[in-house]
Amino acid sequence: MTLPVERVALDLLEADMYPEDWNEFSKFIHLSKYSRWNDENKKRESWAETVDRWWDWLSAKASANGLEGLDLSIKDMVYQRDVMPSMRSLMTAGPAADRDNVCIFNCSYLDLDSPVALAELLYVLMNGTGVGYSV
């Protein structure tokens, strides 16, 4: 049986998971932060699969809000790492972001002026989003 740490090490060695210009640190960050486990293939997503998952989620959200035909060059630029979307959206795109879009935000701010605001602060923090506040 392959342990999870060994599986990550094996995934790092797979040449077809990443574009040729990626260094080992970039591969590790992708695997540890943004790549999702694929039960069907018994391995983590490649960079292309991560970008596809993000793009499919973004396209579905855009279509649901009347924005058809997103420019595919955006997806290509993300794949080439010429531009990057919110890394939180890259990490959580799919069912997690569909359940609650708070998880896609990098940070937020809240005026902590009531018990309700404190509850909101805790909720946002539990979704993994940083919160700045004032009292």
Give the role of each language-model region.
Residues 1-135:
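Extended catalytic cores of very large enzyme megasubunits
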